[in-house]
Amino acid sequence: MAQAALECPACRQNPRSHSFEHLATLASDGTRIFYTAPALTEEAESPAKLENMRIHLTNARSTPWIWVLDCSNMESKHTSSMEFVYGIAKTITAEHEGILRHIVILNGNLWIRCAVAALRLFVRADLVKKLVFADYILDDLRAIELTDVEIRAILRRHYALSSPV
């Protein structure tokens, strides 16, 4: 029997607290693709932020998955503390080792690149190997064996966020 999804208390109050949405499921093996865009979030840095994000990660844990982190339009107000980033890395390492296939970073800005460089010193190499900076988006997404339909779903979401309103 499948476990019911946990509800994030921050998202219950404000659906824009976090950005962690299920985009697609790979037809080939059931791997789910989740999308995060920090520029779309409204939750401020707080002690509860890590616990709330862990709820979303727990809900992703039922099948293999890929996490797309889109850094488009990120400003300083969207960055997180290294404590938060390290907490997410520890959670992924402890609870998602066999099921998180890749973390695809779109438009990796300087802060994200520095955070990843710092994390390399403190997390296991197998987590670092899962990071894909998609500077050449199509090539990188095809390299992790996504179909064109799945790539289009990611790009549609990405360009909707990147395009001026």
Which sequence ranges carry the predicted segments?
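Basic, amphipathic alpha-helical/coil surface patches used to engage anionic, phosphate-bearing ligands
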Residues: 1-165
